[in-house]
Amino acid sequence: MSVKLGPAGVPLSCKGRTIVEGMDDIISLGLETMEVQTVRLVSPQHFEQYWQAGVLANKTNFEMNLHGPYYSELLGDKLQRNRSLAKVEAALQTAKTINARHITLHVGHYAETGRGHEANEQVASVFNGIVQRINDIWNDDDEMYPVFPWLSEGTPSKIGIETSGRQELWGSLEEVLEVVNHVEGTIPVLNLAHIHARGHGRLRTSEDYGELFDQVRETIGTKEFYCHFSGVEHRMGNAMHYTQIKKSDLNFEPLAEFIIEEGSWLDMTLISDSPLLEHDAMYMLQNIEKARHKQLERKAREERRKALAAQTSMSTEELQAREAEIAAARAKDALANMEKKVEEKAPAEEPKPKAKETKKQDEKDSNDDLFEVDEDDDDLF
């Protein structure tokens, strides 16, 4: 099992804002990957820092990834499609410069084609062209190898097709899997917040995640997964906006449990899309470690039961039931002791002392009566 975690962009805690400085911070946190955001437009002046990041990634075996233009209309009319493909071209060139292993792309609205086989065929045709283009860029010029050594040592970036989070956008899980299954060189980008929202909150247990990953594996026969994770606010099958993980009904603990208990076959890159970026990436890493410790504790208990069963006439099931009885009895005793301590600590109610009346106080009261007038409290304000 291999799980790499990282943020979508330069960490919030990074003092510098360049990609290389962001990589340094990510590595120092114990994370292993990042996704560079080029969701709107790639400017030529950025290519120097992109190349520096690519060199560093190549030397340190750090996994770089790239998110292409957010606003795409690959199912639109000819003008819309050409504009979108021009942005994609810039992203592909950046991916080469930065040594990106995965490029995440969006499709956009269904447009006039609507849902169905025709739309999927058109998307497949577009992505066939994109895959061919990244291969051409990667093998463009042998003389470039000294500058980009990863071109000769590695393979072209994989083109990722992201699941969408809204009903009017192409990109349901089934649509993405159908296209990926027919276009070599593409992979599904499983945005788990989008899948959860589009499925009206479908990802709640480790079994739900197991069904999802099994569906992908059975459909396209892959063990490699590129995923986005974040909290999400959703309504009526549509993602409204990302939230931090702890403030969402999309919990990470069930996914961590699935990864540790059932995901030994996974090769996963997990990107934090949360507004907290690296903080939630670290939160995910901590939850995976907790799940791993729970698994080790469970296995240790099972081994202990087997050893006891071999020494006694009891079966492992009987020993487990006995352990449950002892644990329940201890919990009951602990609750009783706690209630007893609370009762002992409760202070007895002390009688209130009677006020002493003095001659001076009587005189003061009589003086107050001289100036007493009836007033409504509301009139004071």
Predicted regions and their residues:
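Charged helix-capping and loop-helix junction motifs
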Residues: 47-52, 81-88, 119-125, 173-176, ...
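Gly/Pro-rich active-site loop or hairpin
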Residues: 16, 75, 114-117, 170-173, ...
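Active-site beta-loop-alpha junctions enriched in small/polar residues
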Residues: 8-12, 37-41, 69-71, 108-110, ...
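C-terminal helical cap(s) of enzyme catalytic domains, especially alpha/beta-barrels
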Residues: 278-297
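Active-site acidic/histidine proton-transfer and metal-coordination neighborhood
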Residues: 74-189
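Hydrophobic faces of well-ordered beta-strands that scaffold small-molecule active sites
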Residues: 3-9, 34-36, 64-68, 103-105, ...
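N-terminal pre-domain/capping segments
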Residues: 1-93, 187, 294-337, 341-344, ...
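Acidic (Asp/Glu)-rich catalytic clusters
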Residues: 23-30, 45-65, 90-99, 131-137, ...
